[in-house]
A protein has these predicted regions:
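Glycine-rich FAD pyrophosphate-binding loop
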Residues: 151-164, 314-326
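Glycine/Thr-rich phosphate-binding loops of Rossmann-like dinucleotide-binding domains
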Residues: 69, 96, 116, 223-225, ...
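Residues at the starts of beta-strands that form the adenosine-phosphate
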Residues: 34, 129, 152-154, 292, ...
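Internal hydrophobic alpha-helix adjacent to the cofactor/substrate pocket in enzyme cavities
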Residues: 68, 73-74, 306-314, 318-319, ...
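A Rossmann-like FAD-binding core segment of flavoenzymes
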Residues: 177-224, 232, 240, 256-259, ...
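Beta1/beta-strand and adjacent pyrophosphate-binding region of the FAD-binding site
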Residues: 126-136, 286-299
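A conserved FAD-binding loop/helix module that cradles the flavin
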Residues: 301-308, 329-330, 400, 409-432
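Flavin-dependent oxidoreductase catalytic cores
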Residues: 1-133, 137, 141-153, 161, ...
Length: 432
């Protein structure tokens, strides 16, 4: 069957749930003992159907139980909304197999690796009024953990709905969408959490709220590009899309038509957004992503966006200053992702390439080759900047003179992945 570095990867999200049951089904035709099947099982509905269809006798697996050790009990009790399902981020595999690290991080289970250190939700010795600012995975996990420990939690979100960056990553991954649904359900069910939507938190907001503790999870600052044309009307960024999903028209959008469309799109999505709808619109609409795209930034965000562009038939160029496109993609996913780019007729990768200017016709750049630097012009109707995030300590520092306990978590403290944010939110709430 191979491993991650084969033409068909074994356990990544590129493989559908239950895909490998055809192997166990064939083994059952000759086996005299019960057959267990253990790869790519994350959805209990698929597992149950495969058992009923006789494709296996026993569901084996690890990642679904890493994500939620109580999953079998929840299945028996039909607690569908409380199932914390694996998002197939492969962080567990990357840490243990690729890097030889302990099994301490999971994209959705903040307690992983700390089971013997303390109770899951140690009861607080003193009930506190806790202000959580930001509702991404760090903020929501902090809010849920603090509430479980007995604190009174106020969860603030500047946009019209909870979810933070997961609202956008859900467009690329249905697995993230179901995790977002889980988080929203848990917040809604908890009586100790009061949600404040469409509320921008400032130092004055904190002063008036008078919390005993503040957990700041407002996300990082998007990294920009300082070259001529970076503010052109054909330029978009991942932050622009997050702003639009939050119902805010991104700043600096030039051109009457362009400005109108961003404003109208922001207004519409503030009322009717769902990840599935946004995914469909991204696939079919020529705006704001045209059929010819240059992506500046070949890290994980750029690669995921590039994969979406590739699958939707867009001519796609991925430009990266480092030696390799996908330099920070996990070991489990990297080979299959880069192989799909190499095999696609509509994708070109430009490593060791520095952008010098952006025009309405495309991107000017300089690529380092063994023969020396070579000037390039990469045609594109849309230029997407996906350079990642920088830390964002402004609000956290402003809160310190106002609140006895202040914790910065998630990308605003240290930009990272969903597993890092999940763990940081949990640990901060346990420290209250």
């Amino acid at each position: 069957m191979g491993w991650h570095d084969t033409s068909e990867p074994l356990t990544t999200k590129a493989i559908e749930d239950g895909h490998w049951t055809f192997v166990s089904q064939q083994i059952k035709t000759v086996a005299k003992k019960p057959v267990a099947q253990g790869y790519r099982n994350t959805d209990p509905r698929v597992m149950e159907q495969n058992l009923q269809d006789g494709k296996m006798d026993v569901v084996a697996g690890l990642r679904y139980s890493i994500a939620d050790p109580a999953l079998p009990r929840k299945v028996m009790e039909d607690r569908t909304c409380d199932m914390r399902l694996c998002i197939v981020c492969c962080r567990c595999l990357d840490d243990v197999v690729s890097q030889g690290k302990p099994l301490n991080y999971c994209g959705v289970n903040p307690r992983l690796g700390e089971e013997l250190d303390h109770e899951a939700f140690p009861q607080a010795s003193k009930r506190k009024k806790v202000m959580v600012v930001g509702s991404g995975p760090a903020g929501i996990n902090a809010a849920l953990t603090a509430a479980q420990r007995g604190h009174a939690v106020d969860l603030y979100e500047e946009g019209p709905r909870l979810g933070g960056c997961v609202k956008m990553s859900s467009i690329f991954s249905p697995y993230h969408e179901r995790y977002l649904d889980y988080l929203l359900t848990q917040v809604k069910q908890h009586p100790q959490i009061t949600v404040h939507l469409k509320t921008k938190v400032t130092p004055e907001t904190v002063r008036q709220a008078k919390p005993d503790a503040a957990i700041v999870a407002v996300g990082g600052k998007p990294l920009g590009l300082d070259v001529p044309g970076a503010d052109g009307k054909n330029v978009v960024s991942s932050h622009d899309f997050l702003e639009m999903i939050n119902g805010h028209k991104p700043a600096g959008k030039r051109g009457a038509f362009n400005s109108f469309m961003w404003g109208a799109g922001s207004l519409f999505l503030s009322m009717y957004y769902t990840p599935s709808f946004a995914r469909t619109m991204t696939e079919k609409s020529p705006w704001p992503i045209s059929r010819n795209v240059a992506i500046i930034g070949g890290g994980l965000p750029g690669c995921e966006f590039g994969h979406l562009c590739m699958e939707t038939g867009r001519t796609t160029a991925i430009i990266e200053e480092r030696k390799k496109v996908g330099f920070d993609v996990g070991g489990s996913d990297r080979f299959g992702l880069i192989s799909s780019f190499k095999q696609a007729e509509n994708v070109e990768m430009y490593p060791l390439t520095r952008v010098t200017a952006i025009t309405e016709e495309g991107v000017r750049a300089v690529q380092t080759t063994p023969e020396g630097d070579m000037e390039l012009f990469i045609p594109a109707k849309t230029v997407a900047i996906t350079l990642g995030l920088a830390e964002n300590h402004d609000l956290g520092e402003a809160c310190k003179p106002l609140v006895d306990e202040v914790y910065l978590v998630g990308d605003c403290e240290t930009p990272g992945r969903i597993a890092d944010a999940t763990k940081m939110g949990y640990r901060a709430a346990c420290a209250l």
